[in-house]
Amino acid sequence: MKPLRYTASALALGLALMANAQAVTTIPFWHSMEGELGKEVDSLAQRFNAENPDYKIVPTYKGNYEQNLSAGIAAFRTGNAPAILQVYEVGTATMMASKAIKPVYDVFKEAGIQFDESQFVPTVSGYYSDSKTGHLLSQPFNSSTPVLYYNKDAFKKAGLDPEQPPKTWQDLADYAAKLKASGMKCGYASGWQGWIQLENFSAWNGLPFASKNNGFDGTDAVLEFNKPEQVKHIAMLEEMNKKGDFSYVGRKDESTEKFYNGDCAMTTASSGSLANIREYAKFNYGVGMMPYDADAKDAPQNAIIGGASLWVMQGKDKETYTGVAKFLDFLAKPENAAEWHQKTGYLPITKAAYDLTREQGFYEKNPGADIATRQMLNKPPLPFTKGLRLGNMPQIRVIVDEELESVWTGKKTPQQALDTAVERGNQLLRRFEKSTKS
């Protein structure tokens, strides 16, 4: 009977372990963070899981922002959506209209977890809030602004002051020519050309990108980025491209790699690219503010955010939503939000995270790490510089990329390209407007 007793005990222990394993609520989290950023996402999830053994956050990289958004919406339609979906900022209007989401303020309320929406930096939270109620629909996560990265060693070689990055676009054009003449393969390259060269160029120089305060005041907005100021800017880049001082290297973040591998002396890219630059650059580099147009009357104004937020998907059970609320609360805690900001270069999404980072002396030890925040808070945003809320904006960005590429290849003039981009983009806006009223 002794072996039987042991067998029964072992069986009971096994059943208990199985019950405990089954009690763990798994929470799928689809994201677009790769490289060093992906490692930081995994680290956050592991720490949360260790502190909350009843829940298991499972981060999964699902490709770039467009791919992840498409995958998430497709999965929702088949009943297989993740609990948490990371969506880039220009997908906000699409997510709001999708009926696939559960507002984060509802998630916290139903979970009985206190949620102070005022803790988030207003210029960030305003992007993801319901225009009618003011409540957050998604939780800010990896918010960024474009910054200028420059190779200090290359500056020295070209006879430029390594502590003085270009302040205006006119300065940048001059610096790029000198850097190219000094032997650099590429004087200047830009990542995310639509976001930086049109969306943020417009806001930073106090110009609207679209009517209706960039879509915040209604879905009947029309695009307005084909005005003389934007055309002049693209024409300047076109001239730089003809001279070989500006190199077009791709639609997304390809310029960051061209920068940290030493090919390009300067790049405008996301502040969130800092993690990879820190890891891979083998030279002294600096971080500067986005250049502004020297002819713009009140520039610089304020930058608008890029990056992404975390959306909670519909159709999950109560326990899953409780775990989601706990995880989002974990991410917003000052020590976690500050660490994410410091390690990645993304903005501190809460006031407490910014204060903690400053108190820790991080900005003194890492000059330039506060540039993205300073740009966002440079001046109080105007009604048309607080961001974009335009339907089908991901597809509009593709159109902008196509039309700008037609400029770099000499097929169209800047005016022709921007006029066509506005015309094609407005067709998508009308389609979105119609879908929201049907």
Curated annotation (Swiss-Prot):
<dbReference type="GO" id="GO:0055085">
    <property type="term" value="P:transmembrane transport"/>
</dbReference>
<feature type="signal peptide">
    <location>
        <begin position="1"/>
        <end position="23"/>
    </location>
</feature>
<keyword id="KW-0813">Transport</keyword>
<protein>
    <recommendedName>
        <fullName>sn-glycerol-3-phosphate-binding periplasmic protein UgpB</fullName>
    </recommendedName>
</protein>
<feature type="binding site">
    <location>
        <position position="397"/>
    </location>
    <ligand>
        <name>sn-glycerol 3-phosphate</name>
    </ligand>
</feature>
<dbReference type="GO" id="GO:0030288">
    <property type="term" value="C:outer membrane-bounded periplasmic space"/>
</dbReference>
<dbReference type="Pfam" id="PF13416">
    <property type="entry name" value="SBP_bac_8"/>
</dbReference>
<comment type="subunit">
    <text>The complex is composed of two ATP-binding proteins (UgpC), two transmembrane proteins (UgpA and UgpE) and a solute-binding protein (UgpB).</text>
</comment>
<dbReference type="InterPro" id="IPR006061">
    <property type="entry name" value="SBP_1_CS"/>
</dbReference>
<comment type="function">
    <text>Part of the ABC transporter complex UgpBAEC involved in sn-glycerol-3-phosphate (G3P) import. Binds G3P.</text>
</comment>
<comment type="similarity">
    <text>Belongs to the bacterial solute-binding protein 1 family.</text>
</comment>
<feature type="binding site">
    <location>
        <position position="65"/>
    </location>
    <ligand>
        <name>sn-glycerol 3-phosphate</name>
    </ligand>
</feature>
<dbReference type="InterPro" id="IPR006059">
    <property type="entry name" value="SBP"/>
</dbReference>
<dbReference type="InterPro" id="IPR050490">
    <property type="entry name" value="Bact_solute-bd_prot1"/>
</dbReference>
<feature type="binding site">
    <location>
        <position position="346"/>
    </location>
    <ligand>
        <name>sn-glycerol 3-phosphate</name>
    </ligand>
</feature>
<feature type="binding site">
    <location>
        <position position="144"/>
    </location>
    <ligand>
        <name>sn-glycerol 3-phosphate</name>
    </ligand>
</feature>
<feature type="binding site">
    <location>
        <position position="270"/>
    </location>
    <ligand>
        <name>sn-glycerol 3-phosphate</name>
    </ligand>
</feature>
<feature type="binding site">
    <location>
        <position position="89"/>
    </location>
    <ligand>
        <name>sn-glycerol 3-phosphate</name>
    </ligand>
</feature>
<keyword id="KW-0732">Signal</keyword>
<keyword id="KW-0574">Periplasm</keyword>
<feature type="binding site">
    <location>
        <position position="307"/>
    </location>
    <ligand>
        <name>sn-glycerol 3-phosphate</name>
    </ligand>
</feature>
